[in-house]
């Protein structure tokens, strides 16, 4: 059975995007964090995105900038199978990308029944839905030392409390802190 994990950057006030859906505040990396991110992203498996994150990621990872900045990661991002949850997209020209057509939980159950572990990147609403459905095996948070004063909060509106057990913590010189959690 495949595991489903999620990686998301959060502000100190719990937002994954500001009030204008901007996430540029989350992209400052020092060399140590860049190496960590690169090695973390090289793993195989399946990627899961919501439409908004997909539309942000596709032009970068299929373009020349990604190939120059992070060639190994770009190769992996383009080669790995990808599932995109969207109510408006019907097709994709990004290699190995499938638009989810079944209901959310059925799609995640099918992914878990497969052989490839899957990782949700960004896509805050998808992360919250997967956690609420009990389908998230691991939550990786990059805590960024900024307060946004408003925006899209990761777990706003979830119907019940979810307990998490900390598995790992890593601090970077730029002030970012990576925390790995499991349900429990």
State the predicted function of each range:
Residues 2-135, 145-184:
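Portal/gating segments that form or line small-molecule/metal binding sites
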């Amino acid at each position: 059975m495949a595991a489903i994990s999620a990686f998301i950057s959060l502000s100190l006030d719990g937002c994954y995007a500001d009030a204008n859906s901007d996430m540029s505040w989350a992209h400052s990396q020092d060399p140590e964090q860049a190496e960590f991110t690169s090695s973390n992203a090289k793993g195989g498996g399946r990627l899961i995105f919501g439409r908004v994150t997909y539309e942000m990621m596709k032009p970068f990872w299929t373009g020349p900038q990604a190939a120059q900045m992070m060639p190994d990661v770009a190769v992996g991002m383009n080669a790995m199978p990808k599932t995109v949850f969207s109510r408006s997209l019907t097709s994709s020209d990004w290699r190995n990308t499938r638009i989810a057509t079944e209901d959310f939980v059925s799609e995640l159950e099918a992914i878990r029944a497969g052989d490839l572990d899957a990782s949700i990147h960004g896509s805050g609403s998808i992360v919250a839905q997967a956690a609420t459905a009990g389908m998230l095996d691991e939550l990786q948070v990059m805590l960024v030392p900024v307060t946004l004063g408003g925006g899209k909060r990761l777990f706003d509106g979830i119907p019940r409390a979810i307990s998490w057990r900390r598995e790992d913590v890593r601090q970077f010189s730029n002030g970012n802190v990576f925390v790995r959690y499991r349900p429990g």
